[in-house]
Every structure is written in C-alpha cells, then in structure tokens.
UniProtKB/Swiss-Prot annotation:
Name this polypeptide is given: Ubiquitin carboxyl-terminal hydrolase 7
List of catalytic residues: 223, 464
Biased composition (Low complexity): 1-10
Gene behind the chain: USP7
Positions of the UniProt region annotated as Necessary for nuclear localization: 70-205
Family according to the record: Belongs to the peptidase C19 family.
Amino acid sequence: MNHHQQQQHQKPGEQQLSEPEDMEMEAGDADDPPRITQNPVINGNVAMADGHNNTEEDMEDDTSWRSEATFQFTVERFNRLSESVLSPPCFVRNLPWKIMVMPRLYPDRPHQKSVGFFLQCNAESDSTSWSCHAQAVLKIINYKDDEKSFSRRISHLFFHKENDWGFSNFMAWSEVTDPEKGFIEEDKVTFEVYVQADAPHGVAWDSKKHTGYVGLKNQGATCYMNSLLQTLFFTNQLRKAVYMMPTEGDDSSKSVPLALQRVFYELQHSDKPVGTKKLTKSFGWETLDSFMQHDVQELCRVLLDNVENKMKGTCVEGTIPKLFRGKMVSYIQCKHVDYRSERIEDYYDIQLSIKGKKNIFESFIDYVAVEQLDGDNKYDAGEHGLQEAEKGVKFLTLPPVLHLQLMRFMYDPQTDQNIKINDRFEFPEQLPLDEFLQKTDPKDPANYILHAVLVHSGDNHGGHYVVYLNPKGDGKWCKFDDDVVSRCTKEEAIEHNYGGHDDDLSVRHCTNAYMLVYIRESKLSEVLQPVTDHDIPQQLVERLQEEKRIEAQKRKERQEAHLYMQVQIVAEDQFCGHQGNDMYDEEKVKYTVFKVLKNSTLTEFVQNLSQTMGFPQDQIRLWPMQARSNGTKRPAMLDNEADGNKTMIELSDNENPWTIFLETVDPEMAATGATLPKFDKDHDVMLFLKMYDPKTRSLNYCGHIYTPISCKIRDLLPVMCERAGFPQETNLILYEEVKPNLTERIQDYDVSLDKALDELMDGDIIVFQKDDPENDSSELPTAKEYFRDLYSRVDVIFCDKTIPNDPGFVVTLSNRMNYFQVAKTVAQRLNTDPMLLQFFKSQGYRDGPGNPLRHNYEGTLRDLLQFFKPRQPKKLYYQQLKMKITDFENRRSFKCTWLNSQFREEEITVYPDKHGCVRDLLEECKKVVELSEKGSGKLRLLEIVSYKIIGVHQEDELLECLSPATSRTFRIEEIPLAQVDIDKENEMLITVAHFHKEVFGTFGIPFLLRIHQGGHFREVMKRIQTMLDIQEKEFEKFKFAIVMMGRHTYLNEDEYEVNLKDFEPQPGNMSHPRPWLGLDHFNKAPKDRYTYLEKAYKIHN
C-alpha cells in the first residue's frame, strides 16, 4: 500500500466540510450514537523566545502559540459511526486543529469499507487570506502494542479552500474493527496526531513577541533580498559599522548607506515588519529590477562593494574585507622542469559544486583538487615549451564570516537553459576546515559554526525564499519567512534543507539550501557582539526618528484629508504680465494655499485670512473664481454678511480646491486706515481693464473698477486713459473679451454698460487700445486679431528621431502655419537650414516617430496635430540631414552591416536613390566606410539568414526588389583580392558558417571562401584559421562538415580532397540553398546571460 501516493488527495467525491455542526450527529439521529472522548494534549514542545518583549515563563503559560503538539481523539461505539466527526480543537500556532474521522464507503465496492482520517485547520474562520504549512503524523493507536500502531505522514499548506488533509482510505474498516489486531477495545478507537506547523501567514502573528525579532515585508517578488538583508543584519559587527558610516549630508532618497542604516535601525527597534522600498529605490533600480531573479551572490557582492566604497575614508574603512575577505593561491606546477606559476587572489565567497557530491567536505575536496595538464592540454611554460603540469588552488586564509554559495542553479548546455539541482547535499552545524588550508594555526583552528541557511523552494523559474538564522550562535534557530519570524528546531533549519527526497520525511524535494553562512568559532563573540542603542550615532537616531515623525504626519493628513479642503488665494499682482485670456494662467499662477476644515464657516475663514495676510477685514474682499458656461473663469460676488454662517464646502459647491481672488486696498494706503469702497451688488458691477499695444503685441493689466450698471461707456474712457498713462483726449478703441477666440468690438460709447456688454456680469473684461492709424502696419494691429492669433497658438515638442528618449525642446507656433513656416521656426532654434530638416508625425498608438512628412505637405500645423487629445502634449519628430530634403526624399534609407578589415561587423545606414540598383547602394556605402589601403576597392552585397549567407546580389539588381525583414540582414563587405577573379571551371566561392552540434544552431559571422578543385582540405583549414585568427590549440577542437538540406557529413581532414560537386545543389533541387561548409565548435562568444526581461544587477548610486 503506497501511503504517500494517497496523501496528496483530499476526500474524492466528498464535499469539503467546513462547518463543524454539519459533521456532528444530533441526539435523536441514531438510537445510540458513538460517544466521543477527547484525551488531553500529550505533549507540546513550546518554542521559547529570548527577545526582550517576553520571558520564557510567559511563553510556557501561553501554549496556544507553540509550534508542535500531540493530541488524541477517542471515538466510542466506533462500529456505529456513520457520519464524519470532529475532535475538540488543539491550538498550535494559535490556530485550532481538529481530528476528523469518517466511515468511507465505495459505491462500486459495497463490501469494502475504510476509515477516513484527516487533520483539519482553522475551518471555522471566515478569513480567506490565512495559510499555514504543517507536517503531521496521523496515527491509530494499538492498545496491545504501541509499536504496532499504524501511522502515515502528511505535509500540506492549509488555507481556506483546503483546510483539511489526510487519507480517505487510511485503514480498512475490517482491520480497525478486528479485536485481534488491537486497534479497537470495548468498541473504542483512539486517533492521534502529531502536528508541527510553521508560523501562519495572514493572521495576527506577533513575530517580536514570539521570537524577539521582526521580518521584512514582501514588496513584490524581491526574491532572496529579504533573506540576504536578514543575514547581513545579524552579522552584528557589520551592522555596527553600517551605523557608523557618516550620512549626515546624504540624499535620503538616493543614499544606499542611509537606506541600509534605516532598514537595520527599524529591524532592531520596530515591532512590525519592515519595508525595503526605500532601499531598492536608493539602488536606482527601475521597478522591473525588483523582480529579476539572479543569484544571491551577485546581489551580495554589489551591495557589499557599494557599502565598502562608501566606507572609504571613514572610521569604519576596511570593515568589509576584515569580515568577509579570504586569500587563496592559484598555482601551476610543472612536473618535469623547475617551473611554477602562482597568483594570490582575494575572495569574498566560495562557490561550491554540489552535483554528485554527498556533503560539503566532498565539495571542498573537489574545489582544491589538482587538475592534471597533460596530453593535448599541456601547459605552455614559456622557454620550457609545452609541459605536463598540475593546476590547483589552495586556501591561504579563511575569513571570519564565510559565505558559501551552493551551485544549485546551473546552465545546462543540452537544454540551453538554467536548471535547479535538487540533489541531497549535507552540511554540518560545525565545520572544521584546517585540512584545506595551506598552513594551519594550532592556536586558531579553522573551526566554523553555522550561522545562516538560505533556502529556496521551487524550480528555476520561481519559488519562495526563506532564511534560517542562528542569531546568537547558540544553536537556537529562527525561521525568517518575509514578514513572519518564528522559532524552529535545529533539524528544521539544517537536516530538512539538505534537499533530495527521503520517503521517511515529509519534505518536498525542491526545498533546499542554496547559500550557507559560517562564522569562525574563535571570532564568534566578536562578530556577534551585541548591538545596543549606544552603538548608533545620536544624529542618525534623530534623523530617522524625524523621518518617522514626518511620515506619521503625512499618514495622518492622508487619513484626515476627507475632513479638509484647499482654498487657493490669488492676489491681483498675479494678473500683471498675463498675456492670455481671462485674468491669469492657472498653470503658472502662484497661489497662497489654505487648508480649511470643510465645516468651518466663512466668517471663521475670513478671520484667519485677515490675520495671515496682514489686512484688517474691512480692507479685504473675497471674489470666488467662477466657471462660466462659455468656458471662462471670472470673479463673482461673495456676500460676507449674508453668507458668514455658511460652511466653506457649501459655499464652494463642493469645489476642491476652491480658488478665490482676494481684493485688498492699495498696500501704500493700508497704513493710513483706508478701507475698500462699498460695493452695491444690486446696482454696481466690477470690471477688469486691459490695454493692448499693437507695436509690442502685448497686453498690459490696468486694474479693476467698480461702476454703476447704468454708467455709459464714454464715462469710463478717462479712467482707461489714466490707467494706461495716455492723455485724456486720446481716442480709444474698445473690445469686450467674451471668451477665447471671441473678442467683440464695442461700437456705441453712448449706451449703458448693460446694453454695450453681452450679458453684463461681475468680472467682465474690457480691452482697449489707441485709435492710431500707424497700428495698421503692425502684424497684429487690433486686439481682436491678437486674441485670434493667441487662440491658434500651440506648444509643440520637437524630439530628435535619432536620439532614443530625447526630451526635445518646446516651440510655440500657430496652428495656422504651413510646413515651411514650421521648418523655418525650428531651423532657427537649431541654427540650421530649414531644407536640412525632415519631420515625422507622432504615432497615435504609442510614443514614437511615425511616417515622414514630405516637404511639399499642403496642410497646416492644425492638420498634423488634430489627432492629439486636448490636454495631451503635442509632439513632432525631426532629424537633421546632410543633404537637402528635396534630394533626400528621392532616396531610400537602407540599413545594413559593414564587415570591416578586422572582421568585425558594424551597423550602418546609407541613402541610395530609391529607384537605383545595388551598384548605387555600394557606391553610397563607399562614402561612409573606410576601405583597406591595399584592398580591391570593390564591394559586394550579401544576404544573411540565421547566421548563414544565402546569396550574393548582383550589381544591376533593383533595390526595390530587396525587401527588408526581421529574419534577414544585408551585409556589405570589400571583396578580398583573392576572390575578385574566380576560375569558374576549377574554383568556387562557398559559404562557411559556425554551428555547435546541431546545424540549426548557427552563430557568429559567416563568410565566403574560395576553394580549388582537388585541393587538399588541410590547406583550406589553414586559410580559415588565419582568417579567423585562432590559436592552434583552440583550432584543434574544430570539426568540419558539409551541410546539405539540414544534414551534415563530417569530413576526414587528412583524407578529404576538395570536390566542387559537393558544394553544388543536387540535380532537381536548384531552388534549395547550396551546401555549405560548417565549422562545428563551442560558441565562446559571450551569450546574453539575461533574457529581454532581465538586466544585470547594478546599484547606480
């Protein structure tokens, strides 16, 4: 019977029971229902915490938080059991655990009956966010002989949808009820469960209370970063040094040392999980960087390197090397001559191979194993020539803190991807390493104590990361699982993370250690010295506490934001200099902002405003800015007396922020006690005055006036002349600024305001100008034309198409401009000729250049920008040309690669005549590339697909026949002198390409090679070696094959003589590619280590 196979399944065909009352039998349901007896908890190994927040006595009193327990459940009258029954709860990790027992019948096998035995967790909870991983032993007690008790193991992640786990067919009913077997006595059966649970997630788990430590928040797939940070935090000597780094002048958002100080300080003092977003932000990473899963060694090195550099020149300089640096010597010793090469190197961690190794000792033995250099692999000993030698490394020193990287993740060349090795690999709590040192010190043996075990669960594509730490080096272990910290046993921390799969243990084989941290026993007290508040500089404490205070204040403001509103006060001086519609530009105006309780009254606000602005209440008047139906925004009357008791939110009509124009007396008159003139809201009107100057094409603000509604326009002319500084007899032309693009001239000056102005209201604007015939010669002679031109103005961002992410520059244009007017304006900005510019539309669906504009485009700028949304930035692209646009538009942009004389490819763009041929393309190419001094001076165009040359294009071939595609590239190269003239009878140009094992896996730079009928292949090989500049030792590893129709035939280099027919298409298959010569060798070019979603770790600050 395969117990483990069954344990992975819930009760097949049965509904999951979540409400205990549904499973209990009520009195009357049966004549004599089975009675249930709960035995007390047999044992519970309560996990003690040594943190300062609690004592061991406290933990012993509160057994509900324990990590493991054994409890029993006795069912009497067992033979009458017909329904599922549940035991009373036993609390582990403060969650209720119950034994569930049921009879199990099989419809297709009526004579077979079994006992269902399950462990249930937290089934009565309404929460859907909790989870708890546990291992358990389910046992039916044998009354006669406890050793014959029947048990099975389970391992499961309990959560709201799978809150019970066990076996539908735990034992045959007949076996349990057979008195001879010993499982039943007096019709009673006792069920027992031993459960060992991890700390739960999604419930009120107080890590500080139970362990004395806090975790780190999971801020979005930061992988092992949390595990690494906890490991570094508990390297106490490092933590002390980090605190001592001077960061007083550092930018709080960019300083890595300050961010690390902040995380360490909060881990030491906080009662709740600590966030890491400020730390990753200080690295200068994009959001994507937090999700990139690379090895922990890389992150550890760049982080410690960054901190080490920041420590230079400070009192803690050298701390990182002192803690983590060791030295090793790499040597090569010749066997038969007196020659030895040595190089001493520093290391900060050791990468240990685990594949095929039983334990850490075997890995160290493999690390220092001597490699024999003999045969084809002899060592070049200079004047001694090639010699047999021994190559290896020896450790000179081992650091106080030893980081061991276990190579769980490795590249598999067969699958061309990284894989995870889940093999069992053992490591001890105490690690003696003297045998691996070149020279030992009897007074200080290299004995190490295990301090941290970093663990990964899952495969190469993802998973979960935790770290087990021995914080004080005393064998009391804790498990740090992101935000949850819990006590754990030594076995959980060490043995359970060996990996592999042991049928006797319920440990998933994909859960195993990938990094170990050992501390030298002689340095244990020094490295783990207690870190107290006295070790933290006072100025750092004050800075971090001030940050906390500010964050708390901002948090409080966010929480109370719904109680407040903003009132934006705009003063009259903000109207001066405004050159547009209405009184001011909302995007440029400087407001005085007040934070006001929504339920406060207008009277209270006016009192506060008066005190803040320094004017008595009779020297100020409030005019809320009111949006009109025509799209303008003008001041409107607010009656302080009538509306004084109304709330601000009521008066603002829920507008937030609420903008108010604050009218005050002239500051020069304020000291004399002058007050604002009275305003009769029923008979008076407030008007604003602007003066337009056609010569400067500008507006001048001339203040505001109160005037009776019955006043005639002519009565206002003297006031306007005075405000503008004109003589009183000056003739004026008047306009009403109604709305954008609508400015009406006032014709009759002898009518009242209500008849002269359209729908007279407070805040109406009159624009006036001199009636001067000289204005007719101005570009914009009247205010009406000025506002019309203003309405057509648009800010356009011009970005250089050739510069990625170019922010560009802004030019204010009229959307009535034609192509040449736009080009002329932009050319002035760039200090170039308009004819040397080409413009491109912006793509509508994404931010980027679209189709080019022809220089004879007949539309206006408005036509080009019509698809932009009203508030969307208007953007066009340009590129500067080396020829006039009229000539350029008749050419074609042709991207290709150029193979230079050093056999290196570079991307170029040439511009041949679009109606030309390949010859024109090659001639244009000669203008932009550098040819060899002693070369042929002749070029050719090759077409390349999948790193293979598939053809040479003839010079008279039309360019329009060369269609670009992502799967093909074009390459231009200078024809070698040896290939200019080919004897077609006896010679041929063949394609040569590189591949490794599979002919479809081509790579590198393909090339053409001249071969001669009957020539020895060794001579061909020699020419290839010279062309590729490959050392003899490396070239010996190459294999050569003729590849035809996807199949390759390896050549015997010593016997093969060149036969041109081997490289000709087969008869009847002329449409297929010609056979080509393949070079089979390993691709040593650096393969992109990261996919398009990945980048190498780099801390930018």
